[in-house]
Amino acid sequence: MRTPVIILTETDLRRLVPLDLAAVDCIEDAFRALATQAVAMPPVLRLDIPEHRGEVDVKTAYVPGIDHFAIKISPGFFDNPTLGLPSTNGMMVVLSARTGLVQALLLDNGYLTDLRTAAAGAVAARHLARQDAESAAILGAGMQARMQSVSYTHLRAHETRG
């Protein structure tokens, strides 16, 4: 009997997958696997839709020994703000590595990508920052600046200057 496909919204994912030390450790483990295992990761597929200033990127990878893999679909339509819509969104499809059956749809609207990027910054800081560093400078004021700040606080205490 086939199990039903799990559908998680951005709200669900924000509740279930916070930007915390476990997320930072997970991303570090993923980088380690990419560097040390025979990870299958094809080039990014990019579909341009020039008449609407749009593009869609599709990314995936498979790590041997992990029961599932995901396919990320990431559209960017850069005139959308003039329509009152976000310029980017996205979703991921989680499949069984054994059967190829769809297990879950993650309707994250880019949240998981934002989380991964912030956690990757924390991994870099963990390995490249001086151990006695007491502050971090973050240039920018958007979503990534805020998320980088949160991710760093999980590594060590930093002062915040606005």
What are these regions (language model features)?
Residues 1-113, 120-122, 129-132:
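N-terminal ligand-binding/catalytic initiation module
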Residues 144:
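Hydrophobic/small residue at the entry helix of a nucleotide-binding pocket
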Residues 141:
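Glycine-rich Rossmann-fold phosphate-binding loop(s) that bind the pyrophosphate
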